[in-house]
Amino acid sequence: MDWGTELWDQFEVLERHTQWGLDLLDKYVKFVKERVEVEQSYAKQLRSLVKKYLPKRPAKDDPEIKFSQQQSFVQLLQEVNDFAGQRELVAESLGIRVCLELAKYSQEMKQERKMHFQEGRRAQQQLENGFKQLENSKRKFERDCREAEKAAHTAERLDQDINATKADVEKAKQQAHLRNHMAEESKNEYAAQLQRFNRDQAHFYFSQMPQIFDKLQDMDERRATRLGAGYGLLSEAELQVVPIIGKCLEGMKVAAESVDAKNDSKVLIELHKSGFARPGDLEFEDFSQVMNRVPSDSSLGTPDGRPELRAASSRSRAKRWPFGKKNKTVVTEDFSHLPPEQQRKRLQQQLEERNRELQKEEDQREALKKMKDVYEKTPQMGDPASLEPRIAETLGNIERLKLEVQKYEAWLAEAESRVLSNRGDSLSRHTRPPDPPTTAPPDSSSSSNNSGSQDNKESSEEPPSEEGQDTPIYTEFDEDFEEPASPIGQCVAIYHFEGSSEGTVSMSEGEDLSLMEEDKGDGWTRVRRKQGGEGYVPTSYLRVTLN
């Protein structure tokens, strides 16, 4: 698929898309520049940190260097310093290979894009100029024809006038002949201009603009490929320093393992052993005459409980009223504001995302079940009851995700049927609509009342729910509202219908409708419009899909 064939009439769309692609390229270059600044700042801060904590005295004058802990710390700082050097290499590599090269490439792409669109606009201007010339020749031809007709009428009138002189009649005939000749020349000029414009228009739509669009497509694909390679440079810059960073990390590990606590104790003994004898016992001194008053228990303060009250109040504030007002996003949740093909793609993405989340939750549920079995068999490893809240939460998530999957599957099926119906519409777009049925449509109000009474009858026959059974929380609210009749299918209007007679409803070509009642053999079908309104339309004007 190429732009020149599929997007032949989307000049502005291609202009915006190619501009967006270049903006994305510039955005990535800017991101890498800031990433380079972060890496440079990170390396600089690491080096400053190492310099701050390195011993200030030489090793021979520093007694602490004899401890393995200090030696390991110094070695650790040196490895961090080497690590900072590798971050500087990453920043340098990204600055050269991404910032400089991609910025230069972006400028080249902008110049190429500008050239292609200038060429396209010139072609459009030439076609518009040709159309203006065609209109001028057409108006001239029309004007000359009127003048020729007027001159012919004048000559005929003078020829029949007995009071007119022969010279006047002859002059009028010559004038009529001249006007007729001028009209013939204008006709030939108009025909030539029309032929030239049709040739230029065919060349414009079938050759010139498709070539320009194909060039734009090639340019955009090259830009996207180069941008993808630029994305990969981030990981390549990291992979280049991974071996050295691995050695730095290995050095840190060796430094950590080289700490010898026993030897450090011996070093401390050797450095600070005094050699003095331990002091002897002290003699008893009696001070029993001095009695210290023991403070009473009543002097001790007790907490007033206010923190607990505050905690309780904060917990109460943390609760949310379940019937609070929520932002309604139902209108755009099914992406119905998008074109059918775009809606299908977005719904497909949402469905795949929900399936991945569902699979993740199911895997987590299986893992929790296995862990619970292990706890039940080996109680000392853990309490099986402690896993119940997590298992219940996982089951709730699974049920919620299953409902969402079903919802998106239904929307996706509807969107796919709409896409297929729209494709079929393109084949029958310009065909003549069939004649509507000669019989009058049924009475829509009586049909609605019948269906409503039937629904009420069915609802009255439902048995009441027993105690102990699961009942929806909001049942009492649902009972206050009578649900409208559910559609039995979907349909698309193939032709435009005015709906001027009683009981009918108007519809536009390509409009999506809900099927409320099938054709009873009289040629009429009852439908409901998305924006409201219900009535009958000719069955032959619809493409129907039953649920």
Swiss-Prot record:
Subcellular location: Cytoplasm, Cytoskeleton; Cytoplasm, Cell cortex; Lysosome; Golgi apparatus
Residue intervals of the F-BAR domain: 1-264
Entry-linked Gene3D superfamilies: 6.10.140.470, Arfaptin homology (AH) domain/BAR domain (1.20.1270.60), SH3 Domains (2.30.30.40)
Domain SH3: 486-547
Keywords: Cell membrane, Cell projection, Coiled coil, Cytoplasm, Cytoskeleton, Endocytosis, Golgi apparatus, Lipid-binding, Lysosome, Membrane, Phosphoprotein, SH3 domain
Site feature: Mediates end-to-end attachment of dimers: K166
GO BP field: endocytosis; epithelial to mesenchymal transition; negative regulation of cardiac muscle cell apoptotic process; positive regulation of cell growth involved in cardiac muscle cell development; response to food; signal transduction
Start-end of Low complexity biased regions: 441-451
Residue span of region Interaction with PDE6G: 293-547
Coiled coil segments of this chain: 67-259, 332-425
Chain segments carrying region Disordered: 294-323, 420-485
Chain positions covered by the region annotation Required for interaction with FASLG and localization to lysosomes: 415-547
InterPro entries: AH/BAR_dom_sf, F_BAR, FCH_dom, HR1_rho-bd, SH3-like_dom_sf, SH3_domain
Phosphoserine modifications at: S296, S298, S299, S426
Region (Interaction with CDC42), start-end ranges: 293-483
Summary of the tissues where the protein is detected: Expressed in adrenal gland, aorta, brain, heart, kidney, liver, skeletal muscle and spleen.
Subunit structure: Homodimerizes, the dimers can polymerize end-to-end to form filamentous structures. Interacts specifically with GTP-bound CDC42 and RHOQ. Interacts with AKAP9, ARHGAP17, DAAM1, DIAPH1, DIAPH2, DNM1, DNM2, FASLG/FASL, GAPVD1, LYN, microtubules, SRC, WAS/WASP and WASL/N-WASP. Interacts with the ligand binding domain of the thyroid receptor (TR) in the presence of thyroid hormone. May interact with CTNNB1 and HD/HTT. Interacts with PDE6G.
Homology family: Belongs to the FNBP1 family.
Known role: Required to coordinate membrane tubulation with reorganization of the actin cytoskeleton during endocytosis. Also acts as a link between CDC42 signaling and regulation of the actin cytoskeleton. Binds to lipids such as phosphatidylinositol 4,5-bisphosphate and phosphatidylserine and promotes membrane invagination and the formation of tubules. Also enhances actin polymerization in the vicinity of membrane tubules by recruiting WASL/N-WASP which in turn activates the Arp2/3 complex. Actin polymerization and dynamin may promote the fission of membrane tubules to form endocytic vesicles.
Name the UniProt record assigns to this protein: Cdc42-interacting protein 4
Gene this chain is encoded by: Trip10
